[in-house]
C-alpha cells in the first residue's frame, strides 16, 4: 500500500469517527452492554435506562489501573462506563455476598466476584441495606456477571451520568 493510500485511509477513519461523535453516536465494545451502536440522548436518568456515567476519581483511578476502563475525559482520565440504572431515590438496595436485592427482590447476575478476570482480588461495597438518596443512582449490568458496577463501588451521584443511550444496532 502506498503512503498516499495509507494517509487517505487514516484520514477517512478519523473523519468518520469525528462525524459519528458529533452526530451523537457511540460504539460500545465492552461486555457491560451489548456490543453495538448507540445514540446519545439527553434527559434525566430513569430506572432501567442505559446510561453513560463517569466514575468518581478514586474509583476511576483504580478501574483504569486494573484495565477495566479505557482512557477518556472523565475524572481520573477514564472513559464513561455504560451501565443500566438499577435504583434511584427512595429505592432500597441490599448488598449481600449472594448479590443485590432491590426493594427486597433479588437482582439476577449480581453475585459479587471475589476475583477479577486477571485473578486479582475484588473488594465489594460493604454488606448492608441502603436507601438511595435523592441525588444518587445505583448502576449495574444485566448483560455481564463480570461487570465493574455498583456492587463494587456503591451509588453514584446523579451528576456523574453524562447521558442516556439508546441502542440502534447491537450484537447479543
Where are these regions (language model features)?
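Extended hydrophobic leader/signal-anchor segments used for secretion and membrane insertion
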Residues: 1-172
Amino acid at each position: 500500500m502506498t503512503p498516499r493510500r495509507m494517509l487517505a485511509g487514516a484520514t477517512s477513519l478519523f473523519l468518520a469517527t469525528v462525524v459519528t461523535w458529533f452526530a451523537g453516536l457511540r460504539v460500545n465494545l465492552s461486555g457491560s452492554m451489548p456490543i453495538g451502536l448507540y445514540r446519545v440522548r439527553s434527559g434525566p436518568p430513569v430506572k432501567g435506562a442505559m446510561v453513560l456515567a463517569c466514575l468518581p476519581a478514586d474509583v476511576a483511578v483504580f478501574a483504569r489501573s486494573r484495565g477495566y476502563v479505557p482512557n477518556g475525559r472523565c475524572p481520573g482520565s477514564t472513559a464513561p462506563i455504560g451501565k443500566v440504572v438499577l435504583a434511584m431515590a427512595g429505592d432500597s438496595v441490599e448488598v449481600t455476598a449472594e448479590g443485590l436485592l432491590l426493594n427486597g427482590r433479588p437482582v439476577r447476575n449480581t453475585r459479587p466476584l471475589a476475583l477479577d478476570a486477571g485473578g486479582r482480588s475484588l473488594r465489594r461495597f460493604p454488606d448492608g441495606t441502603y436507601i438511595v438518596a435523592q441525588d444518587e443512582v445505583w448502576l449495574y449490568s444485566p448483560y455481564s456477571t463480570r461487570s465493574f458496577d455498583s456492587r463494587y463501588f456503591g451509588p453514584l451521584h446523579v451528576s456523574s451520568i453524562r447521558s442516556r443511550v439508546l441502542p440502534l444496532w447491537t450484537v447479543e
